[in-house]
Amino acid sequence: MKKLVLTGAAGRLGSYLREPLTKLADELVSTDIAEDIGTLYAGERYVQADLADLAAMIEVLKDADMVVHFGAIVDEKPFMELLGPNFVGSYNVWESAYQAGVRRVVYASSIHAVGMPKKADFIG
């Protein structure tokens, strides 16, 4: 595989998988909204991008063979703070992959699919 794109590269899962994913492709393009993701591995390139920006996602996914989409906000937040990255952002990744002719997308479903207890339930 020539080009693999990873979204959410600064997150918990993305940061753990960056190094192993470099072994699957000639080029790993790691992306996140964070300014920095630390030291890059051999074969890895970092592109700071907002999932909610369709034009940015189209550019990042250009010529990609595969996308591993882990980018999202996983904290308890008001809906409007989640809308851009979690809903619009996921749509943009799928739409960009379709436009680029990407044949494989790996997607980790939201933790909210099974419900998320309020943080207050664990405090006190």
What are these regions (language model features)?
Residues 4-24:
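N-terminal Rossmann NAD(P)H-binding glycine-rich loop of SDR-like oxidoreductase domains
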